[in-house]
Amino acid sequence: KTSSVSFIEKNDKGSWGQWSDFVKAELLITIDAKKDRIVVNSPEIQVFTIKSYGDKIESETTKTVPFDCVDNNGSKCKILVITRKDEKNRMQFYINYSELKFVYNIYN
């Protein structure tokens, strides 16, 4: 489940702007490896087809699980599930497009 969401987008010059303030967003996110699918149950349901599973990346402070995906509109994106070990294992779910990124704070 998520508690909040923030986004960032590229400006006219192609540089990333500033992350928006987090706003409340209580949603259920499901990762279904058997169906190669990730579903974000937002008011407009987002379905991502997993095209490839990346190798888990672990450092002293984070653990990252990457997925290369295609959304229900056919747009490519990279989804990252990041566990912040230095922040009591706080989890975040990133949806990264070339021009736009979303991050959801996750709680169990």
Task: Go through the PLM ranges and name each one.
Residues 1-45:
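N-terminal secretory signal peptides
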Residues 21-24, 31, 60-62, 74, ...:
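Short solvent-exposed loop/turn micro-motifs enriched in small/polar/acidic residues
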Residues 23, 41-44, 48, 59, ...:
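Mature soluble domains of exported/periplasmic/lumenal proteins and thiol-rich metal-chelating peptides
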Residues 80-106:
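Short, exposed beta-strand-loop hairpins at the edges of beta-sheets
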